């Protein structure tokens, strides 16, 4: 179509609009645009269905029987010719009448689903067959108990792909099977699942070596009832207000019972002690039927049981020495440990326990007495009395090796009362303890200045 024809068509359209201007404005005007009525829509659909289906009977509310101008076609007369073998097939309906066959009434509902199989054989309820035909198989439930059967009037489909796989290839040849799985979109390298009884462990299970701190390497295949040493690292101590509710639980999976505690038993402890000598008791013995706190308090009443806890003229320490860990909530005693932190705490605790007299001073005041002048003795005594009352600003012990700083430190706190926020600043002595409370502390060493250049 050239440009001249396009121009002529445009002119014809303009002439048509000018001649029918009133009719067009009445029908398609902006004020008259609306959908057709339901009656017009229904009649249009009936006309369309009557033309496509070719029915001669009158539809309710539609065309009449006498209207013979419409082309009539029957679906049952349609036929298709296969381009491959020239066979002519007949289109059949994929639905079945109710109560088809000799049965009068079928109580169970019949669900029919037509499925096309491309495996080269008929899919029946008893496995694959060697039939060369492919066809339509419908899965039925109710009448045929869910078995897969082949429709009797199934025909060859011309558009179906041909995949010729013999029975031997399907059963034995894995290469053909993988190729077939690849063409169908399945995973050809899938590993089949094998059932395995997990309740029976393997006889040759590997032995997993676990290392217990201070005890060396233990093997996992040791019997659960065998007694063994348990380190403090594998023990959790839970305390409460009720003494009878105290429990000692183990993280050690080989512990026989939650009421047995076996810690650091030496060969000397396993031998029975003599009647006349000192009883060689240890926390490593079995505790049953009583709370651990009562048992430990009974041992504290005997000065000979815990060396270093009695007066200065007590007997010679036993070997191995029993030591008390001050970091535990309960006074839990155990044999020696190689942890450097525990040894440092034990060293500090032993120095404090050596000064049991009334006139004795804590070790962290010795350096203060040596460094101050005689005129500050009263201040030092006041500091000592403050330390005896265990005030919160007690400086750190000398055994830690951290020097005590003299002076002031500036502290800043952001306060909030629910309506406004403000910042407060003040100075505290450097020897006082840092606390989250926004308040001023007192000097604990007696050598910090009363004011600094920040205080003004």
From Swiss-Prot:
Single GO MF annotation: metal ion binding
Keywords (A to Z) from UniProt: Host cytoplasm, Host-virus interaction, Inhibition of host innate immune response by virus, Inhibition of host interferon signaling pathway by virus, Inhibition of host MDA5 by virus, Inhibition of host RLR pathway by virus, Inhibition of host STAT1 by virus, Inhibition of host STAT2 by virus, Interferon antiviral system evasion, Metal-binding, Phosphoprotein, Viral immunoevasion, Zinc
Listed Basic and acidic residues bias regions: 63-76
GO CC, any one term: host cell cytoplasm
Residues with Phosphoserine modification: 257, 350
Pfam families on file: Paramyxo_PNT (PF14320), Soyouz_module (PF14313), zf-Paramyx-P (PF13008)
Compartments where found: Host cytoplasm
This protein's record includes keyword Zinc: yes
Keyword Lipid biosynthesis belongs to the record: no
Ranges for region Disordered: 53-92, 265-324
Family named by the database record: Belongs to the paramyxoviruses V protein family.
Functional note: Plays an essential role in the inhibition of host immune response. Prevents the establishment of cellular antiviral state by blocking interferon-alpha/beta (IFN-alpha/beta) production and signaling pathway. Interacts with host IFIH1/MDA5 and DHX58/LGP2 to inhibit the transduction pathway involved in the activation of IFN-beta promoter, thus protecting the virus against cell antiviral state. Blocks the type I interferon signaling pathway by interacting with host STAT1 and STAT2 and thereby inhibiting their phosphorylation and subsequent nuclear translocation.
Note: The P/V/C gene has two overlapping open reading frames. One encodes the P/V/W proteins and the other the C protein.
Protein name: Non-structural protein V
């Amino acid at each position: 179509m050239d440009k001249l024809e396009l121009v002529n068509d445009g002119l014809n359209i303009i002439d048509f609009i000018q001649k029918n201007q009133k009719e067009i404005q009445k029908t398609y005007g902006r004020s008259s645009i609306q959908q057709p009525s339901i009656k017009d829509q229904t009649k249009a659909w009936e006309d369309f269905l009557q033309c496509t289906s070719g029915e001669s009977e009158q539809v309710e509310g539609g065309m009449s029987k006498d209207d013979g101008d419409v082309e009539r076609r029957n679906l049952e007369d349609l036929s298709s010719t296969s381009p491959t073998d020239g066979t002519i097939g007949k289109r059949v309906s994929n639905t079945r009448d109710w109560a088809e066959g000799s049965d009068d009434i079928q109580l169970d509902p019949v669900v029919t689903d037509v499925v096309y199989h491309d495996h080269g054989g008929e899919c029946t309820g008893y496995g694959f067959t060697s039939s060369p035909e492919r066809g339509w198989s419908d899965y039925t439930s109710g009448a045929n108990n869910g078995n897969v059967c082949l429709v009797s009037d199934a025909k060859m489909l011309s558009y179906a792909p041909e995949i010729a796989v013999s029975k031997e290839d399907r059963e034995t040849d894995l290469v053909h099977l993988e190729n077939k799985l690849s063409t169908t979109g399945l995973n050809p390298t899938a590993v089949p699942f094998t059932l395995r009884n997990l309740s029976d462990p393997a006889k040759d299970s590997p032995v997993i070596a676990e290392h217990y701190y201070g005890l060396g390497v233990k093997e996992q295949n040791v019997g659960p009832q065998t007694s063994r040493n348990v380190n403090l690292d594998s023990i959790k101590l839970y305390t409460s207000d009720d003494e009878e509710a105290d429990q000692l639980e183990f993280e050690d999976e080989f512990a026989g019972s939650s009421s047995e505690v076996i810690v650091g038993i030496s060969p000397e402890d396993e031998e029975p002690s003599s009647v006349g000598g000192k009883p060689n008791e240890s926390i490593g013995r079995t505790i049953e039927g009583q709370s651990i706190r009562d048992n430990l308090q009974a041992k504290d009443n005997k000065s000979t049981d815990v060396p270093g806890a009695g007066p200065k003229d007590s007997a010679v320490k036993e070997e191995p020495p029993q030591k008390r860990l001050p970091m535990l909530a309960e006074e839990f005693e155990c044999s020696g440990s190689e942890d450097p932190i525990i040894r440092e705490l034990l060293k500090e605790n032993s120095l404090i326990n050596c000064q049991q007299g009334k006139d004795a001073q804590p070790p962290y005041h010795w350096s203060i007495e040596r460094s101050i002048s005689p005129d500050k003795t009263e201040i030092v005594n006041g500091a000592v009395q403050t330390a005896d009352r265990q005030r919160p600003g007690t400086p750190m012990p000398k055994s830690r090796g951290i020097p005590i700083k003299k002076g002031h430190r500036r502290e800043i706190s952001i306060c909030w009362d629910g309506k406004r926020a403000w910042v407060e600043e003040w100075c505290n002595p450097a020897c006082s303890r840092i606390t989250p409370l926004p308040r001023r502390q007192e000097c604990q060493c007696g050598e910090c200045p009363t004011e600094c250049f920040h205080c003004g």
